[in-house]
Amino acid sequence: MAFGMTDFHRAQILLAEDDDAMRSYLVRALEKAGFAVDAVDRGTAALPLLHSKHYDLLLSDIVMPEMDGIELAQRCNEISADTKVMFITGFAAVTLKASREQPLAKVLSKPFHLKDLVLEVERVLEDRISAIL
């Protein structure tokens, strides 16, 4: 069964990003691409949402106050094992750590073009759909 771009529309994304401007920018871009996005400013704020709603993708910065993105991804896996994880970060060393600790997660390094973000999100969601089938 082939999936087109419209199959991703309304996919539920939880965005955890502590930088207000970046968070707002990402929400606008993802919503414009057709995704439903809930956004929080730290990992600890994401936990109640993960408990109350199913998300297709957790899109998280890695370096955040209170709870970093790697710990958030581990908690997400405990709460909702079928939620895919994708990290965004501006730190190369953090990217290596994330790749070791969350080997199935995609890591996108800042700066990135919004088109690249949307393409990577679609790839991750396509992999999720393929795994379900």
How does the language model describe each region?
Residues 1-14, 115-133:
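Non-catalytic signal-transmission and effector/linker regions of two-component phosphorelay proteins
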Residues 17:
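Conserved acidic carboxylate
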Residues 41-45, 68-72:
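Acidic catalytic/metal-coordinating carboxylates
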Residues 61:
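Active-site residues of response regulator receiver
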Residues 64:
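Receiver (REC) domain active-site loop signature in two-component systems and cognate sites
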